[in-house]
Curated annotation (Swiss-Prot):
GO terms for molecular function: histone deacetylase binding; methyltransferase activity; zinc ion binding. The keyword Metal-binding applies. Residues 1-35, 111-167, 601-642, 659-726, 854-905, 1039-1079 are annotated as: Disordered. This is SET and MYND domain-containing protein DDB_G0284059. Its EC number is 2.1.1.-.
Length: 1280
């Protein structure tokens, strides 16, 4: 039952404003309640639900409730149903399920008090689900007083809050804020350039002397001897021995402190307390990601301060001799300093947890709260930790654990502060009404509680979990060294030219897991030391640090302990390892791993065997066995019993929580369908609807939650409409699983036994890695000189730390180190990561805006200094000049502001993630696959774990091929051949290169008469493809020249850099030492002009290009070739100008559409329909159509794009294709084409389940699609 109350006009306005501003600020909670009959009057009525105590507002008989940010799917379906009545019965079904999903959500943000009549006294009042302020006692002094004056977090005035939410996101973060964030991230990255602390003049002199000395030497041993003489001479002459050895012997903390003094510093106190206080200030500004960075740094510095204090105390004890009163006081001081300050540590963990809750990262928030609780015995923030962990458990649907934490917090909070008491009682009330089944871990916990309620089972369970994390042994780590490979994969040695290959010994169907392999050695890229786990390479928001060096960071105690046993225990505190290059670090870890494996394999054997092993290794170094084939272990593993783990996507925003899984236990319910009133924050146009639920709008870990988009001018005024009331009944148990959770089995492993047959296990061995071809003869003199120099420095380091690292004495040799350095240039895998580029995009756009504003201001100043007549003449002259300059108008000087376009980077509708190399690894077994520009395998990374699957069916005897980077789907033939030769030292002769395939096949302009079938018919156009003639010798020469030019440029840039003035490498760096990097230039994800890397063909010699048709043999050269090339360049320029004007400047005029259509017309006349260049224009036209509210045209161009991609790929096994299908389904859903939408969503979900990458976009999209599919399923169930 519901009870009605009357509101005054002023009160109703307050309520409406507050409801508008609850979008995105509250947290979603799952409920089920019944509505009584609605009064369809013209007044404003407040309704209090008797079951949940929720305050519901009615305007003209329609519900106005606080819909959490992201429930735009519900609004989409409502708008569809209102405007498309032609769908008949399915209309009511979708509408009914929409009301169910929306009515079960409650917002925890407090609304203004209303005058209640006969309100139930037992109903709890709504309070804030999360305390939006950091711990009160830890705030800066200037902020403590306002917080003490209020008993609970206050909400800004309604009008002020509305204005705040309506402004675009970029107005919340101005250019200064983004500059600060970039500076902060760069300073906290702990990124010291390789060997940057060497004296610059010494390093330059060494490199120049090396290059000159070995330029005419061909023998490798002679080069090494010459470099050794120069190296030793320069060390003695320049007295640089002290500088080199000081770096080798330095500690990690010492190098970080030294480097920090000469890099960017901030105006606050550089202590743990200073960083924590600055984090509190940013938290008050709701910059949660920035605050979290500072809290992390505060925790790291706190550990360093403890270590420094302990070292200082020990020195004092030694000086005082430990006797008398002085020694006793020193001991007391040591005890005081070494004891962690619980209040500081607990407040840091509590604040980090609160940031994670506001970022809606509930799983990480629960872990962080547990860390704080483990440190705290009894503290003023203990109740907050329990309270916030309860919130995290509640949103993770672990209601039993949430209830326990809320009860603990309730008990503690009664003794201290009652600010959160109402919210805790509200949560407990909700959990009581939601009788949901317990999850597996909760059932175990409940059984323990029932056995002995008086025992400390929680503490025992936590201790057992910690013991399991700590109990990491060498044997458990060695188990990961075994690679799991399908038994149908066979390794052979084909020839000296081809080398080793992997071949299918039997038929292998598509989507079969072929390889599962952990890296033999790996390391993070230095630019991402502060963002990823050192062990598993997964992104972390709240890291924990090594207590000894305070540098290595991990996502959990398990990773910390595992890495400590595996490698960090030997490397901890050695400063040289954080400044050497990643190639040098991999070589050091490779030799250390070899020594560890050797000692494990030779336990209990005689002492003479190491000498025999040394002799064998020396022989293998002189004559490496390039034909070595690894043999499988005797036993096989049934993959049906050991299926690969497929990670479930987790929600990162509240937008995808339909909340029907939290329905109450009654089997039937009754609901009344109504149409909600369109408010200022509800998207009412096609562009806003798609922008608010854009599938590429992922909430990043490093940016605060996006605010609802402001309405366009056409939808600024609110409107309301009502429909006929429909009553229905349904079985709630059938809708209970509508929301996805971690327990839902969405990714069922295929049951086809052919996909999971027997698998062989291969032990990762150093012998296989040592057999890789080092390509000594292919490395240039410059690169060889640099590697020899690095080898001597590494040798010097290993001589000093041989025992600590456990490296065999025979491996401390320049020749061994140099061999591995040369090998790793071609056999290193680059592990991809996805970086949020929102800040850089907004910053560049803001800079463009500032430049435009400055130009306008200058023009206004000039005009104000002139007479009115002259001013009018000047304006007319300017208009005429603008009309005569097509490059400025209408493309650049658009009247539309940049935020008017829904695909502007300011509107969160562009692809926010770009791919970059976050780490490097060596996978021995996967390295045996050869390259093809049209590969038949697909790589998937889970952190640093590698899985390789068959992309499509592989026949018996067919070679299993990977892709080293350049792909025929993306890159032209010339670019592929040059890049592969420069990076991997071979001329590609794969099928795609032999057939001269590329992303842009050119039509044959010729025609012929079909005299055999129809002698009198008109000429028929030739269906062949124009293939360009390529001289391989000239191409190799061009590749060598290009490589030399690049090395000269790099050398010049290094000379121009000042000492210690080094910034992190750009995201689009040209370092391509990776194995599979085949998504960098993706045509389907080029919605960002700053990230766009279009590889247009370079036509330096227009007249001497030679083409020949593959079918009719017609030839094009001379003027014809020049004309063809000119038309291609014109179409490229038209497309680039139109695309940048649309995305960068927000120009949505008809002129832009005309320009894109003209470019499309030119490209259609030149290229075949499957051309990538044609697909790029289809993608741009679909974006343009959405921004112009033309959904039908957007769907048309998107379908053409999908057809273009499928015809070019030859299959549909692509995550990019799945994203395009998801966009198409979203557009059809907005247009009311329910059947087409459901079909597109089904295809997108099917593709992404099998072929999703580790891009966060894929998980976000897949989560949205699965929710929508379940919504359609629920609608069909209701219809039955």
């Amino acid at each position: 039952m519901t009870k009605k109350i009357k509101l005054s006009n002023s009160e109703s306005n307050k309520v409406n404003n507050n409801n508008n501003n609850n979008h995105g600020n509250g947290h979603n909670h799952n409920h089920s309640h019944n509505h009584g009959e609605m009064c369809h009057g013209h007044g404003i009525i407040g309704i209090v639900d008797s079951v949940t105590g929720e305050n519901i507002i009615q305007v003209n008989g329609e519900n106005l409730r606080s819909v959490p940010n992201g429930h735009s799917l519900i609004h989409n379906i409502n708008s569809i149903i209102n405007s498309h009545s032609k769908h008949g019965k399915i209309k009511n079904i979708l509408k009914d399920s929409t009301i169910i999903s929306s009515s079960i959500n409650l917002s925890d943000k407090p609304i203004n008090k209303i005058t209640e009549e006969n309100s139930p006294p037992s109903s709890p009042t709504l309070s804030s689900s999360t305390n939006t302020t950091t711990d009160r006692q830890e705030l800066p002094q200037q902020q403590q007083q306002p917080q003490q004056q209020q008993s609970q977090p206050s909400t800004p005035p309604p009008q002020q809050q509305t204005n705040q939410k309506q402004q675009p996101e970029f107005n919340r973060y101005q250019a200064n804020d983004i500059l600060f964030r970039n500076k902060l991230t760069r300073s906290l990255s702990r990124n010291i350039p390789p060997l940057s602390l060497l004296k610059q003049n010494f390093k330059d002199e060494m490199e120049n002397s090396f290059h000159t000395a070995i330029s005419n030497i061909k023998d490798l041993n002679e080069k090494v001897e010459m470099v050794n003489l120069i190296f030793q001479h320069n060390l003695s002459e320049n007295n640089a021995m002290v500088n080199v050895d000081s770096i080798i012997h330095s500690s990690t903390s010492g190098l970080l402190s030294e480097y920090k003094q000469i890099t960017e510093t901030f105006d606050w106190e550089q202590t743990s307390k200073g960083y924590k206080n600055k984090g509190n200030e940013l938290f008050q500004k709701k910059q949660y990601s920035d605050a979290l960075l500072l809290y992390n740094e505060s925790l790291r510095i706190y550990d360093m301060e403890l270590a420094a204090a302990a070292t200082s105390t020990n020195l004092n004890e030694k000086e005082n001799g430990g006797g008398g009163n002085v020694g006793g006081s020193a001991t007391a001081t040591a005890t005081t300093i070494n004891t962690p300050d619980v209040s500081i540590l607990s407040s840091i963990h509590s604040n980090r947890c609160l940031c994670l809750v506001n970022l809606e990262r509930y799983k990480e928030g629960a872990i962080e709260a547990t860390r704080g609780i483990d440190l705290v015995g009894s503290s003023s923030v203990l109740h907050k930790l329990y309270y916030r962990r309860g919130i995290c458990y509640y949103h993770l649907r672990k209601h039993y654990k949430a209830k326990k934490d809320f009860l603990r917090a309730h008990t503690l909070i009664e003794k201290r502060d009652s600010s959160d008491l109402a919210s805790i009682e509200n949560y407990l009330f909700k959990i009581q009404k939601l009788s949901l089944p317990l999850q597996k871990d909760e059932e175990i916990e409940q059984e323990l509680d029932n056995k002995n309620n008086n025992s400390n089972d929680d503490e025992k369970q936590q201790q057992q979990q910690q013991q399991q994390d700590i109990d990491v042994t060498i044997s458990s780590i060695l188990e990961k060294s075994e690679s799991l490979i399908d038994s149908r994969v066979e390794f052979l040695y084909q020839s000296d030219l081809v080398g080793r290959i992997s071949e299918a010994s039997d038929f292998i169907p598509s989507n079969t897991v072929l390889y599962q392999e952990e890296p033999y050695v790996s390391c993070l890229d230095r630019n991402y030391h502060s963002q990823y786990c050192y062990n598993c390479f997964k992104e972390i928001l709240s890291p924990i640090y090594c207590k000894e060096c305070s540098n290595s960071q991990y996502c959990s105690n398990k990773c910390l302990n595992e890495d400590y046993v595996k490698q960090h225990g030997r490397e901890c505190g050695k400063g040289f390892l954080i400044i050497c290059s990643h190639e040098s670090l991999l070589v050091i870890r490779l030799l250390a791993r070899k020594g560890r494996d050797y000692r494990e394999a030779n336990k209990g054997k005689k002492e003479e065997e190491p000498q025999q092993q040394q002799q064998k290794q020396q022989k293998s170094r002189k004559l490496p066995n390039l034909t070595f084939i690894p043999k499988p272990n005797p036993t096989q593993i049934d993959q049906n019993l050991n299926k690969p783990k497929i990670v479930l996507p987790e929600p990162t925003t509240a937008a995808i929580n339909t909340a029907l899984s939290s329905a109450s236990t009654p089997t039937t319910a009754t609901a009344t369908t109504t149409t909600t009133t369109t408010t200022a924050t509800t998207p009412t146009t096609l562009a806003e609807t798609l922008s608010s639920t854009s599938l590429t709008e992922n909430k990043s870990d490093s940016t605060p939650p996006p605010t609802p988009l402001p309405p366009s001018s056409s939808s600024s005024s609110s409107s309301s409409s009502s429909t006929t009331t429909t009553t229905f009944s349904f079985n709630m148990s059938e809708l209970q699983n509508l929301q996805i959770s971690q327990d839902d089995e969405l990714f069922d492993v295929p049951t086809d036994p052919a996909l999971f047959g027997k698998s062989n296990t291969y032990s990762q061995s150093y012998e296989l890695i040592n057999s890789f071809n080092p390509h000594f003869e292919h490395h240039s003199n410059d690169s060889m000189a640099n590697m020899i120099f690095d080898a001597f420095v590494i040798e010097r380091f290993l001589l000093y730390y041989q025992k600590d690292l456990g490296i065999l004495s025979e491996d401390i040799d320049v020749h061994v180190i140099l061999r591995h350095l040369c090998q790793l240039t071609t056999y290193t895998f680059a592990i991809p990561g996805y970086i949020d580029n929102h800040d850089s995009l907004v910053l560049k756009t803001l800079q463009l805006q500032q430049q435009q504003q400055q130009q306008q201001q200058q023009q206004q100043n000039q005009q104000s200094n002139q007479q009115p007549n002259q001013q009018s003449n000047q304006q007319s002259n300017q208009q005429s000049n603008q009309q005569s300059q097509p490059n400025q108008s209408p493309i650049i000087q658009s009247q539309n502001p940049p935020h008017a376009s829904p695909f502007s980077p300011l509107r969160y509708s562009v692809q926010k993630y770009s791919q970059d190399k976050i780490g490097y690894a060596v996978y021995p077994m996967a390295s045996l696959m050869n390259h093809s520009c049209d590969n038949n395998t697909h790589l998937q990374y889970d952190g640093c774990s590698l899985t390789i699957k068959s992309l499509f069916n592989i026949e018996k005897g067919e070679e299993i091929l990977g892709c080293y980077g350049p792909h025929a789907f993306l890159n032209p033939l010339k670019d592929r051949l040059i890049n592969l030769y420069n990076e991997f030292f071979f001329v590609c002769r794969c099928k795609a290169c032999s057939e001269k395939s590329g992303p842009d096949p050119i039509k044959c302009p010729g025609s012929y008469h079909d005299h055999l079938n129809s002698p009198e018919s008109s000429p028929v156009e030739c269906s062949g493809t124009l293939l360009e003639s390529i001289n391989m010798n000239q191409l190799v020469t061009m590749a060598k020249l290009q490589q030399q030019q690049q090395q000269q440029q790099q050398h010049q840039q290094q000379n121009d850099k000042k000492k210690f003035n080094s910034n992190p490498t750009n995201l689009g760096s040209n370092n391509n030492n990776n194995y599979l990097n085949n998504n960098f230039n993706n045509p389907l994800r080029n919605g960002n002009p700053f990230l766009l890397k279009q590889t247009y063909d370079r036509y330096d010699d227009h007249e001497h290009r030679y083409f020949c048709c593959s079918k009719c043999g017609i030839e094009l050269n001379g003027f014809d070739s020049f004309s063809l090339t000119s038309q291609i360049i014109i179409s490229d320029n038209l497309f680039e100008m139109g695309f940048k004007a649309m995305t960068l400047y927000g120009n949505l005029s008809k002129d832009i559409e005309t320009m894109l259509l003209r470019a499309l017309e030119l490209r259609k006349s030149i290229f075949k329909p499957c051309s990538k260049k044609i697909g790029d224009i289809y993608d741009s036209l679909s974006r343009f159509s959405i921004s112009r509210e033309d959904g039908a045209s957007a769907a048309k161009y998107l379908e053409l794009l999908i057809e273009n991609v499928i015809s070019r790929l030859g299959h549909s096994n692509s995550a990019d294709l799945g994203r395009e299908y998801s966009k198409l389904g979203q557009i059809y859903l907005t247009l009311g084409e329910i059947e087409k939408s459901e079909d597109a969503i089904e295809k997108a979900e099917s593709i992404l389940m099998s072929w999703k990458s580790n891009d966060p976009t894929d998980e976000e999209v897949l989560f949205l699609l699965t929710n929508r599919r379940k919504l359609f399923t629920a609608a069909h169930l209701i219809n039955k």
